[in-house]
Amino acid sequence: MQLVPLELNRSTLSGISGSISISCWIIVFVPQIYENFYRKSSDGLSLLFVVLWLAGDVFNLMGAVMQHLLSTMIILAAYYTVADIILLGQCLWYDNEEKPAVDPIHLSPANPINENVLHDVFNEQQPLLNSQGQPNRIDEEMAAPSSDGNAGDDNLREVNSRNLIKDIFIVSGVVFVGFISWYVTYCVNYTQPPPVEDPSLPVPELQINWMAQIFGYLSALLYLGSRIPQILLNFKRKSCEGISFLFFLFACLGNTTFIFSVIVISLDWKYLIMNASWLVGSIGTLFMDFVIFSQFFIYKRNKKFILN
């Protein structure tokens, strides 16, 4: 493959951002599926959130097929649906598993070791144990004994720094893969002769399939509605425990790059109408995901205050 220089234009910018968006959406479900598997629990996720997202992806798939979108988009829509089913399966499986019985002796108020943690054990807002009865990895590290009274803050900052570096590395890798996959295609197409167009043939017009648009708007409404139960669950628990930060980070990045890839091509009204349902869904869910992002940081500070 011959490397070729980039020509920055609307098509190039749209292609790069679109490819990055696809990379984000391919990986988006993996962090949450792993989080559920690691904790052997999905109690941090709202079941209604997963069900509505699955319904939205089903309508998105139907709309993509009816609107005759690119085969890549149809394959991705089908992939999203399968990933949703896996996520839903985890929720149903772990919810039906037997929870470990609580030992009333070890949690007795008469036991001085548990005097300060009895309330927290029964409080969903500050879980000390995961579903297997094992201490959470971060809580374990922050609880490390030290003669320094500020050791808890130092450990917390150290854990947060490691997690931040890890997240930056993962996100950068996904963005890089998205760019490289686009650039390889760009180089291959660059070396091929352009297709010969017959000037006598009329330029094909954009055809709007209104049934596909209806499915697209239904999908957008379901995507928007899916975030509400999750936001309310986080607010009720005063915690984002059990939710993968990368899950929503990749969703935000995927939506942002998708929106840019669409509007950078053209602002023609007919073109925007054809893509309006997908744009509405992406913009709306992006706003809702920012709300969940704010909950991550708000409840993270609350947890630090409680630990101190």
Swiss-Prot record:
Present with 1800 molecules/cell in log phase SD medium. Keywords: Amino-acid transport, Glycoprotein, Membrane, Repeat, Transmembrane, Transmembrane helix, Transport, Vacuole. It comes from the Eukaryota. GO terms for cellular component: cytoplasm; endoplasmic reticulum; fungal-type vacuole membrane; membrane. GO terms for molecular function: basic amino acid transmembrane transporter activity; L-lysine transmembrane transporter activity. Gene3D superfamilies: 1.20.1280.290. Belongs to the laat-1 family. Coiled coil: none annotated. This is Vacuolar lysine transporter YPQ1. InterPro entries: LAAT-1 (IPR051415), PQ-loop_rpt (IPR006603). Amino acid transporter that moves lysine into the vacuole. May also contribute to low affinity arginine import into the vacuole. Has also been suggested to mediate export of cationic amino acids from the vacuole. May function as an amino acid/proton antiporter. Glycans are attached at N9, N189, N275. Disruption phenotype: Severely impairs lysine import into the vacuole, and partially decreases arginine import. Resistant to canavanine. The lineage of its organism: Eukaryota, Fungi, Dikarya, Ascomycota, Saccharomycotina. One of its GO terms (biological process) is basic amino acid transmembrane export from vacuole. The chain crosses the membrane at residues 13-33, 45-65, 69-89, 168-188, 206-226, 245-265, 278-298. It comes from Saccharomyces cerevisiae (strain ATCC 204508 / S288c) (Baker's yeast). PANTHER family: SEVEN TRANSMEMBRANE PROTEIN 1-RELATED (PTHR16201), VACUOLAR AMINO ACID TRANSPORTER YPQ1-RELATED (PTHR16201:SF35).
